[in-house]
Amino acid sequence: MATIQSETDCYDIIEVLGKGTFGEVAKGWRRSTGEMVAIKILKNDAYRSRIIKNELKLLRCMRGLDPEEAHVIRFLEFFHDALKFYLVFELLEQNLFEFQKENNFAPLPARHIRTVTLQVLRALARLKELAIIHADLKPENIMLVDQTRCPFRVKVIDFGSASIFSEVRYVKEPYIQSRFYRAPEILLGLPFCEKVDVWSLGCVMAELHLGWPLYPGNNEYDQVRYICETQGLPKPHLLHAARKAHHFFKRNPHPDAANPWQLKSSADYLAETKVRPLERRKYMLKSLDQIETVNGGGAASRLTFPDREALAEHADLKSMVELIKRMLTWESHERISRDKNAGHSNPPRSDKGPAPDKTLRPDPELFDSGSCPGEWLSEPEWTLEGVRGPRAQGLAPRHSHPHGPSRTTSFLQHVGGHH
């Protein structure tokens, strides 16, 4: 068993949890406290030094946050030797992708998606106070803390791709966000802000219900095509301003058309790039409203005598879809706001760790208006059963999951680049 030592502590390496292209994550025992920790280990070279420097800057900016209240991973320390860099974090249980995979990608009930959503929105609100854009929100970067003791309590992890907004706002074509969760303004080359994280969270919410990514594009053209086929084309003024519009759209040859732009066809894209567009969607939705009908959604409305649980799940699902629609908008200014007062209530804590979030309440100012989505998150009854997985509803994937047979441990995702 290897041992590594910082200036103030000593860690016994128990096992390697995951490996990536440039490093690994290990489970370690912290001798000073007797707690298990996660240690991200990277080679000590100039390239990784730049990566580490950015992540450390962000983690130090977050020092003032309460990790339990803000739902972000607790950072313990950084140290290095001649060969390796070491970042030490609290040890969490598993990420949402691993949880989905463990449960055969069965749909998660809307009440549990609500629990997760509120906590991540709170994390984003706290990050906004620090002018931080996470820029890589996805199921792998949302971790379950302790599913047995605190079901569906989560924390946001991996700030290796995060940025201070003032430092990146003028970057013309930032390469941020994993493709499935990449916001339209990044795809099209438009000005962006922290609302890119809201788009990503909307995609994650849909994926937790569908058991499959909403927009699993093989490349940026497929990504834009999928969004257009479900949500329609962006408004003309967006495409006029978009630096990358010509990558995906062309001028409409009909001068009287309502939209002077049209999406390039798959044949157009193949002729231009020699890359054949692929179909990787499990559900080819014609609108976001159709999310509600997938995996038994709306079943309660078809029953003659639905029980209370079925009716509650149906109402939850309808409200969830309304919220997703407010998060997945072409224009970022139309997305829900992450107000600075969002979710100010502190969850209960004890010496044994965080207690279940039975007292979690969102602040009404989280949203721009008191519409249905806000009411959905304000529901006072939080169902927190001690179960490890969602009810086994829905179909297993019909073909290989678009994320591939395995994804490296979350901490390492940013090191290998975005897909």
Language model features by range: what are they?
Residues 349-419:
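Intrinsically disordered, low-complexity regulatory tails and linkers that flank structured modules
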Residues 236-323:
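C-terminal lobe substrate-recognition/regulatory segment of protein kinase catalytic domains
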Residues 24:
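Conserved N-lobe ATP-binding subsite of Hanks-type protein kinase domains
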Residues 36, 41-69:
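Conserved N-lobe beta3->alphaC-helix segment of eukaryotic protein kinase catalytic domains
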Residues 116-117:
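Activation segment signature within eukaryotic-like protein kinase domains
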Residues 197:
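Conserved catalytic-loop aspartate of Hanks-type protein kinases
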Residues 128-146:
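Catalytic-loop of the protein kinase fold
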